[in-house]
Design a protein with these regions (language model features):
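Mature, function-bearing regions of proteins
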Residues: 208-212
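Soluble catalytic domains of membrane acyltransferases
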Residues: 26-205, 217
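N-terminal membrane-anchoring alpha-helices
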Residues: 1-30, 214-216
Length: 217
């Protein structure tokens, strides 16, 4: 297990921390690389090809006692994953169940922020306004914005990093080696398209849960 630098936002969890470290060991998952010793950054994870990415990702966050804010599709906060799509509404995927209200409370307390994909206008602007007033934060985003294969990244991570003047840190979700590989931090120095090409070259060939990462602009 890697060490967490002193500037990183942390939240000590007496039960969930040790339990998550135990579960990662049982599942034979590891966390490699180094977290930059910075008080503000955006972690971007890929390839995001299955809902179990989120499960292992949550275990990693809890195992390291990180205090994070993560953005996820609104339906994952109240519904259960399903292999069959019952609705064309992107905010109503999955299967509703009686404890959806409790699921939402738990995920929000862990740092989750629901993103309504049908009407997501203003989400990034609101986030920029919120975090510009904070001294430390750790943001988590899946730039593919879903588990399906997409032709390009969503631009949210780019504008967060650019407007907040913070680095973004690529994290490989590597199912072949059962590891979250933390790469070197990157600063926004060019257009969204150019930054995307840079990140694509980092993630290219990484084996996710159901597919190998590939993307052609």
């Amino acid at each position: 297990m890697i060490k967490v630098p002193e500037k990183i936002p942390k939240k000590k969890r007496i039960i969930l921390g040790p339990l998550s470290r135990f579960l990662l060991k049982i599942f034979k998952w590891d966390i490699t690389g180094e977290i930059p010793n910075l008080s503000k950054m955006v972690l971007i994870g890929a390839p995001h090809s299955a809902m179990r990415d989120g499960w292992y990702g949550l275990l990693a966050v809890l195992a390291l006692d990180l205090k994070v804010t993560f953005y996820g599709a609104s339906w994952i906060f109240t519904r259960l994953p399903s292999l069959i799509t019952f609705s064309k509404n992107l905010d109503k995927l999955g299967i509703p169940w009686p404890l959806g209200w409790l699921q939402k409370i738990i995920l929000i307390r862990l740092g989750g922020v629901p993103v309504y994909r049908v009407n997501s206008r203003g989400t990034i602007k609101a986030a920029i306004e919120k975090f510009s007033r904070m001294d430390n934060y750790l943001l988590l985003i899946a730039p593919e914005a879903g588990t399906e294969l997409v032709p390009k990244f969503r631009s949210g991570f780019y504008y967060l990093a650019k407007e907040l003047n913070i680095p973004y840190v690529p994290v490989e979700i590597d199912f072949k080696n059962r590891a979250f590989n933390i790469r070197s931090p990157e600063n926004v120095t060019s257009s969204f398209e150019e930054e995307s090409k840079k990140i694509i070259s980092i993630f290219e060939g990484v084996e996710g849960a159901t597919r190998v990462f590939t993307m052609s602009e």
